[in-house]
Amino acid sequence: MRSSYIENRYGEILKTFVIALKPLVAVEVGVLDGYSTIHLAAGIKVLREVFGMFSTLESYDLFEDYEYKHGEKEKVQEYLTGYGLDKFVLLKKGCAFEVYKNYEDGSIDLLHFDISNDGKVLEHLMETWHNKIRAGGVILFEGGSPERDEIEWMKKYNKKSIRKVLKENEIINNEYTWVVYPHYPSLTVLFKKGGCSSCELQ
């Protein structure tokens, strides 16, 4: 199973966020081989079985339709079934910047986004998904550390710095507080303002 998250056990962080934040509607964009999906779904399982919540997780990817590095939808489904998590997540094929149209404004509690992220991807995310996140909701975005901005493919293809966008983007500055977990590949956590103050970093 491929994931840059594996080395520093980011899966446990994702699961913990789900359990702590208790989202009713969680969405993931970017699945690859399903590492993050498995851990998010494990969190959803806890919410349903321990807390009696009716939480949902929908995970989107282009899978075989993506010409570069991609996972196979059927294989990811097999992983989920093998872990007993298949009933806690719905895998869907879809484009990252089209499927936001499936959701009403303010309807998403937690969004995990990991699609070869760079600064331009983050800008596009804020333009398209921001209104879909409820006040007090959270966006988990792979990347955000200085080290992550310097990786080989970011430099080779002259990709825009994620960190620069975090510091300068108007929507982020006005509507979110954020923190970055620095261990590679890093994870940016953006808390949308306006909800319960205990859900935001001061």
Regions flagged by a language model, labelled:
Residues 11, 15-202:
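S-adenosylmethionine/decaboxylated-SAM
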